[in-house]
Each structure stands twice: as structure tokens, then as C-alpha cells.
From Swiss-Prot:
Main location: membrane
Compartments, record wording: Cell membrane
Biological source species: Mycolicibacterium smegmatis (strain ATCC 700084 / mc(2)155) (Mycobacterium smegmatis)
Keyword Membrane: yes
Protein name stated in the entry: Putative zinc metalloprotease Rip2
Biological process annotations from GO: proteolysis
Residue numbers annotated as active site: E61
InterPro entries tied to this protein: Metallopeptidase_M50B, S2P-M50-like
Cofactor(s) in the UniProt record: Zn(2+)
GO MF, any single term: metal ion binding
Gene expressing this chain: rip2
One Gene Ontology CC term in the entry: plasma membrane
Length: 259
């Protein structure tokens, strides 16, 4: 495949570029706040984390779409999935707004948008790769954000680095959550092509309940504890202090300082 069609097909939308700009603005405010907890600190980290998470949702869905495009589903281009426009990834409130709200309230990287792909002609291996491409974006972002925090952490700019660490932690939670073999999630999507047809048909109706299954997982104490033990097991490889993550989460939920 030559470079020209690739450049023509992948066109970041102005909305995605705006999300990047807002993320950078939040980071700048958090950087200016230095190591002092003040209103500017809360505003900066909140913008950095929420806009940064929205950007990661776009990259996650773009990963699915771009991989499918490489395997022959060129309909993703006409549907706008290669523009990274968050409004193209299904319903803006339920698919994007709800995960952002959950981030703000609970600090969990909840699955976001979805792209509709034509994969029926693909091999089982290709279908699995398409499913895993989204979580791969979260993995890359987690390594990048936590790696930068580990390498360049400076107490003089603790507010900024706590926001970056928390955003990196959210990528880890999203990675683990998406890889669970629950119908409707990417982990099951990677496994499904290798199941026999009878099993696929039996589990197909459960896909519509994937959201509810995840909610049950997160509100059941024993399952919630198991989930976060797994998340922190992966997170600990980064060498970043969990204190930074906690501080970043508290700054993101700025209202917690008063209520």
C-alpha cells in the first residue's frame, strides 16, 4: 500500500485537533500551578484528564477502524472513523459522555465509543487483531504517560505530574477492562473468532448486556477487589508511585475538596 492513499484516508478532524488543544491547555494550567494546591490546580488537572481521556477514546476506536481498513474494510473511511472525530463514534452522550462522566466520578477507564466494522470476510486471526487494536492504543498511551512520569517526575511540578500519572492509570484500567472475555468487550471480540459456531451463536445475545455485566463487576465488592488487584499488578510495573495517582484522582474530582 503506498503512502498517498494512507494520507488521503487518515485525516484528523478539527474537533479532534481541538480536543488535543484543550488537553494541552489543561496541562499548561497544571504546570503553572506547580506544586501548590489551589483552584488553578483543580481546573488544570480536570481539563487535562477529561480532555486527555476523550482523546484516548478516539485513539482506541481509531485503532479498531484503521486496522479493519488495512484488512479491507474501506467503508470505515466513508463513515468517518479515520478522522478521529469523537462525534463519529456512535452516540456522543452514551458512548463518549457517559465514560467521561464515570472518569470524573469514579476514576475508572470505562469503555467508550464503538465502530461498526465489516469483518465477515476476514480470517479469524485478522478479526482478533482488529479487536485487540483498540486496547493496544491504551497500552501505548499507558506506557508513554507512565514512562514520562517515571523519567521526568519533578516535585516542583507535582500537580502536572499527578494529572499525567492519573491519566496513565486510567489507560491501565481501560486496558484490563477491555481485555476481559466478556461479550461486548474487546477481549471477547478477540476470542470469538476462534470459538465454534454453536458457542458463538449461544453467546451472541449476551453482547447487548456487556455494559450491565461490567457494571455488576464494578459494584460487586469481591469482583471489584479482584479487578483492581489486577490493575495495580500491571500498574506497579511502571514504578510510578500510587500516591501520584491518588493525588491526580482527587484533583480531577475537584468537588471532593468541598463535599
Amino acid at each position: 500500500m503506498n503512502i498517498r492513499p494512507l494520507r488521503q484516508s487518515v485525516r484528523p478532524s478539527p474537533i479532534f485537533l481541538l480536543v488535543i488543544a484543550v488537553t494541552a491547555a489543561g496541562g499548561a494550567l497544571a504546570w503553572i500551578a506547580a506544586d501548590t494546591i489551589r483552584p488553578l490546580s483543580y481546573v488544570g488537572v480536570f481539563i487535562l484528564v477529561i480532555a486527555g481521556w476523550l482523546m484516548s477514546l478516539c485513539l482506541h476506536e481509531f485503532g479498531h477502524a484503521f486496522t479493519a481498513w488495512r484488512f479491507g474494510d474501506h467503508g470505515v473511511e466513508t463513515r468517518g472513523y479515520l478522522t478521529l472525530n469523537p462525534l463519529k463514534y456512535t452516540h456522543p452522550m452514551l458512548s463518549l459522555g457517559l465514560p467521561v462522566l464515570i472518569i470524573a466520578l469514579g476514576g475508572i477507564g470505562f469503555p467508550g465509543g464503538a465502530v461498526y466494522l465489516q469483518t465477515h470476510w476476514m480470517t479469524a486471526r485478522q478479526k482478533s487483531i482488529v479487536s485487540l487494536a483498540g486496547p493496544a492504543a491504551n497500552l501505548v498511551l499507558a506506557v508513554l504517560l507512565l514512562g514520562l512520569t517515571r523519567a521526568f517526575w519533578d516535585p516542583a511540578h507535582a500537580v502536572f505530574w499527578s494529572g499525567i500519572a492519573f491519566l496513565g492509570f486510567l489507560q491501565v484500567t481501560a486496558l484490563v477492562l477491555n481485555l476481559l472475555p466478556i461479550p461486548g468487550l474487546d477481549g471477547y471480540g478477540a476470542l470469538e473468532p476462534h470459538l465454534n459456531p454453536e458457542t458463538q451463536r449461544a453467546l451472541a445475545p449476551a453482547k447487548q448486556w456487556g455494559f450491565l455485566i461490567v457494571v455488576v463487576l464494578l459494584i460487586t465488592p469481591a469482583l471489584n477487589r479482584w479487578f483492581f488487584e489486577l490493575v495495580y499488578w500491571f500498574f506497579d510495573f511502571s514504578g510510578v508511585s500510587s500516591y501520584l495517582v491518588s493525588a491526580g484522582g482527587q484533583l480531577t474530582r475537584f468537588w471532593s475538596a468541598w463535599f
